[in-house]
Amino acid sequence: MVMTDNIADMLTRIRNANQMHHLQVVVPISKLKVEILKVLKEEGFIKNFFIKEFKREIIISLKYTIERERVIKGLKKISKPGLKVYTSVEKIPKVLSGLGIALISTNKGILTDNKARLEKVGGEVLAYIW
């Protein structure tokens, strides 16, 4: 099976594991996925992630509250292989009035919507996470 949208696959795996309250989820490795996971960890949406180089996979540790509530309430892939969505710095969207984040692929790497505004760069809107 040929996978055309690796990011959508990773987000779907995270969403499904999160809904089932799994502690970890495994995804195939790629540089873009690692960059996205760094942002998710920095923003507090995941606990951690580990790269297993010899198996070419990433193990993502999901994060829950003390009451076993999900930290990630929702994920939505915005840019798709058939329809790329780009934004300028003036039109960067706010997710749930600032409660969530937009992942934006810029020439300075993968940034959140807030960091992209601070850096004054636009780019491809990859996903919304709240």
UniProtKB/Swiss-Prot annotation:
SUPFAM superfamilies attached to this UniProt entry: Ribosomal protein S8
Alphabetized Gene3D superfamilies for the sequence: 3.30.1370.30, 3.30.1490.10
Gene (UniProt): rpsH
Entry's family note: Belongs to the universal ribosomal protein uS8 family.
A Pfam cross-reference name: Ribosomal_S8
PANTHER family in UniProt: 40S RIBOSOMAL PROTEIN S15A
Subunit relationships: Part of the 30S ribosomal subunit. Contacts proteins S5 and S12.
Organism, scientific name: Phytoplasma mali (strain AT)
Function: One of the primary rRNA binding proteins, it binds directly to 16S rRNA central domain where it helps coordinate assembly of the platform of the 30S subunit.
Signal peptide limits: none
GO cellular component: ribonucleoprotein complex; ribosome
Record keywords: Ribonucleoprotein, Ribosomal protein, RNA-binding, rRNA-binding
Superkingdom of source: Bacteria
GO molecular function: rRNA binding; structural constituent of ribosome
Transmembrane domains' residue ranges: none
Protein name: Small ribosomal subunit protein uS8
GO biological process: translation
